[in-house]
Amino acid sequence: MVQMRSKNMAYESGTNNYSDTIANGNTLPPRSKKGHSGRRKRSETLPIACNNFCVTRQIDDDEQAFKMLDKVSHLKKFSAEDGDDNNIFVQWADDITDILFGLCCTGTFLKLLISSALSGRAKTWFDSTTEGIDDHVIKAYSFEKFLALLSEEFDGARSLRREIFTELLTLSIDSEKSLEAFAHKSGRLTPYYLSSGAALDLFLTKLEPQLQKQLENCAFPMTLNLALLITACEFAKRASNHKKYRYKNTRDSDICTPKSKNTAIVSKLSNTKTISKNKVIEKSDKKNYFDKNSQHIPDPKRRKQNEPGMRLFLVMDEEKNILTSRNVSANAYTSKNGHTNLSDLHTNLKNSKSQQCAVEPISILNSGSLVTGTINIDLINDEVLGTKEETTTYDERMDGNSRSLNERCCAVKKNSLQPITSNIFQKNAEIQGTKIGSVLDSGISNSFSSTEYMFPPTSSATVSNPVKKNEISKSSQVKDIAQFNPFMTNEKEKKLNPSESFKSPGVSMEINRLSRIAGLRNIPGNIYEDSKMLNLKTRKCYPLHNFAVRTRSAHFNDRPSNYISPHETINATLRSPASFDSIQCITRSKRVDAETNKATGSAKSENIETKSRKFPEVINPFLVNTTNKKESD
């Protein structure tokens, strides 16, 4: 029974160990021997099992390698940085040992697994260290050997502390900042890597001899912290003394050199004075003078270049060539053909090296019409010019290709503004009469024509007897002023012919002189056109009172009879300028009674008054007294 039973067990086991027993027919050993032999077999089969794992499963090495890499990648990596200490390294070593336990692999693959579990400085050092090992030698490196290599280098962040120690050796202590750096780095090394005494000796070697003697002679037992404190106090004392020395030097330099400072202030003041003087001169030059051979082009924004216009040129002679300017002004009017010749004037001005500048046009109308320009009288005033120089002004009309139509020139001499007699001007007017008539008949009659100014110099040959000239101007002064003043004309008065303004130069000049005194512009000749100045003819005149002061507490009925409320004036689009207050009326309009100083009522104003009194039931509480007076009347 025992034999049959042993045979069945051996057959069921199917092992090669019992095959010999079955074949030879031998019996099994006793029970005690069985247990002993079984233990021996297990001890003997462990390396065999390991060998079978490594050898028989070589086909599955790639799959196992990927699994190992995945496990290591999820592991917390060791970097050996400043915050990593010995405990962190031990924890990392235990974790990677658990992952790689039972793996029968060596060499390059194991090196790759360990490198994937490192980062930072630890990974850099491990890769650089194992890179130089031969492939045949690295096959003998097991996991324990790689781990010992890492522990030797990174146990307690040994390499990091070594780097800090090298920095301490090269550090020089010469300021408070370097002293703080030494204290910080030595504090990281003293407990584990560097002793307190060694750190103190290293610190003393870096100080100056004076500080070394001061620390050696100290009465207290010297430690690293005490040495750092004494050195910091010494550096702070030196810094304060240096600041005081610099401040003292600056004060001494300021006290010793007061003259240079004052001279600098004086030079600044002189520079500011010269700059202010130059600015004043520049402003006056902009008004009166211009550089030689320089032409001031008018602003294109203020006039259209494509439309015909008139330019006013101001030619100034800085070199005071009086004879040259007089000859030029005389030749401008005494041409061979009897016309004003601008080309000769241009050539003469260029030969005399005079100065030209274009003044912007004063007014520009629609295209195809005449353009007027009036000479600014401020250029002749003594306060504006400030110097006694002769100027030659001429105006030029640009009308397409032809420049000869309506060309007028005038020569002006300062302090010699005298009107020309009518007989001399009539000669010029007769020559230009045909051209002016043709222009007026051609449909340009509703445009403005500027009043001509002619101021010849005293030495000119065209000047006639001044006594006769003054008589003519005085005789025609009052009559022509009443005709030319638009604020004193009546509707029934006849319109003036525009050509008549060319036949009375003295009168036109006197009118413009009076308007200049009043602060007005020069009055054009054809200002009486219905389409332009309709409201100026119908405006009523009244004494120039200050109604705001006079009627502040008065009733409406106490105001002057010729006072017109702004609500009663219809179609009064033009407002009288403030300069009208200085005008003294020479003649009165027919609408104002000279004796009673009251304006005659018109149908239009009566209708307006009746319309304004239609609603008696509406009572204004502020006008109770006024309404009572009206009811009593």
UniProtKB/Swiss-Prot annotation:
Keywords: Membrane, Transmembrane, Transmembrane helix. Residues 31-42 have a biased composition (Basic residues). Residues 12-43, 593-612 are annotated as: Disordered. Residues 13-29 have a biased composition (Polar residues). It is found in: Membrane. It is a multi-pass membrane protein. Signal peptide: none annotated. The chain crosses the membrane at residues 99-118, 217-233. One of its GO terms (cellular component) is nucleus. Present with 105 molecules/cell in log phase SD medium. This is Uncharacterized protein YIL092W. The lineage of its organism: Eukaryota, Fungi, Dikarya, Ascomycota, Saccharomycotina.
